[in-house]
Amino acid sequence: MSNFAVAITFKLLTIMMKENTVKIFEQSFKDNWDRPCLTDYNTKETITYADFARDIAKIHLFYKEIGIQEGDHVAIIGKNNPTWVTLFLATITYGAVIVPILQDFNPNDAQHIVNHSEAKLLFASKSNWERLDFENMRMVRAALSLDDCTLYEQKEEEVVADVL
């Protein structure tokens, strides 16, 4: 099989996987709209599938507003929580690439992963954010809180609108 045929086959498989994955989630949301979806065991707050779907849609709009495109990388570092899960699923269903970074990595390693991945956007928990050096993240245009999606810092004025 030629390199061209392999590339076309891979592209078709990628498209089919994305379409099928999105369809599975869409059907799950429809079937369970009013049922509990995610629970934060620290706060005991539970969100429904409807809330989850709306949050994913808001993140998609946010990505579009700030110019994130399919294939762009979005990094996330912090403890797993409902926001982490929502960002993860929103990113992959948008067509961007999620770069999950273990919260326990030392700051130099975490920063290296962000830079090496060429992430354009970073979501970080407060404790992780305080240990990172935003100015040395070459490609990251904006960094937001993993806890409440508020803006920590951005490189250009007006990059991040109040979409979230």
Model region roles, listed by residue range:
Residues N3, T9-T14:
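Short, positively charged and aromatic/hydrophobic N-terminal segments
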Residues I24-T48, L164:
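AMP-dependent adenylate-forming
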Residues M17, C37-N81, V85, L89, ...:
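Conserved AMP-binding/adenylate-forming core of the ANL superfamily
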Residues I66, T93-V159:
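Structural core segment of the AMP-binding/adenylate-forming
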Residues M1, Q27, A142-L144:
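Intrinsically disordered, low-complexity segments enriched in Ser/Pro/Gly/Ala and basic residues
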Residues V22-F25, W84:
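A general structural signal for well-ordered alpha-helical segments in protein cores
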Residues V6-A7, R141, V160, L164:
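N-terminal non-cleavable signal-anchor helices
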